[in-house]
Amino acid sequence: MGYWNSKVVPKFKKLFEKNSAKKAAAAEATKTFDESKETINKEIEEKKTELQPKVVETYEATSAEVKALVRDPKVAGLKKNSAAVQKYLEELVKIEFPGSKAVSEASSSFGAGYVAGPVTFIFEKVSVFLPEEVKTKEIPVEEVKAEEPAKTEEPAKTEGTSGEKEEIVEETKKGETPETAVVEEKKPEVEEKKEEATPAPAVVETPVKEPETTTTAPVAEPPKP
């Protein structure tokens, strides 16, 4: 217990005092910055054409986390990505973005989370120069799961139809075999009918002509006187 009071408690007190001092200093820096917002807005409007390409270039070169924070700044995100935010603020200082220098210095001293107000203000002004973000429609997971069974049922239907087609083809094939057999069986009958219709040529006996005897008619005698 004596060690706790003599060693640990004093450290906590110093830490709390340090944090409270940091918060107080950060609050003072935020207040000073808020007073200069009107001037910053005027400078941004005057340099709008000049800043446009530079802002887009610095934005494209930064990380995905910072890009998300620029478009939608949140205190939790600023604290979590404090180092990346600080780096981006320094890039804005290089292109002389109005108000970025004061915010970069405050963020470097106290952390982006402690001066979230000024950082958010600068990010909102930066986002004005950025092209509109194309948002893709996100399909809920439940809808995707609901669609999956429907998709799997379709092949089953095609399989069923293909199976039916196969059965029909098989039946037709089976049905064709008797017809072919009948045709084959009928062929001999047709041939028989043809044979009956066309009888074999009968042998014609040519009668032997007997030698003709030439009988001379009797000569009429002249009448007697």
Swiss-Prot record:
Coiled coil, from the record: none
Positions of the UniProt region annotated as Disordered: 140-225
Up-regulation conditions: Accumulates in response to CuCl(2), mannitol, sorbitol, and flagellin oligopeptide (e.g. flg22) treatments. Induced after long treatment (2 days) with NaCl, KCl, MgCl(2) and FeCl(3). Slight induction in Mg(2+) deprivation. Slightly repressed by dehydration.
Nucleotide-binding listed as a keyword: no
GO terms of molecular function: calcium ion binding; calmodulin binding; copper ion binding; microtubule binding; phosphatidylinositol-3,4,5-trisphosphate binding; phosphatidylinositol-3,4-bisphosphate binding; phosphatidylinositol-3,5-bisphosphate binding; phosphatidylinositol-4,5-bisphosphate binding
Binding partners and assembly: Interacts with Turnip mosaic virus (TuMV) P3N-PIPO.
Protein name in UniProt: Plasma membrane-associated cation-binding protein 1
Biological source species: Arabidopsis thaliana
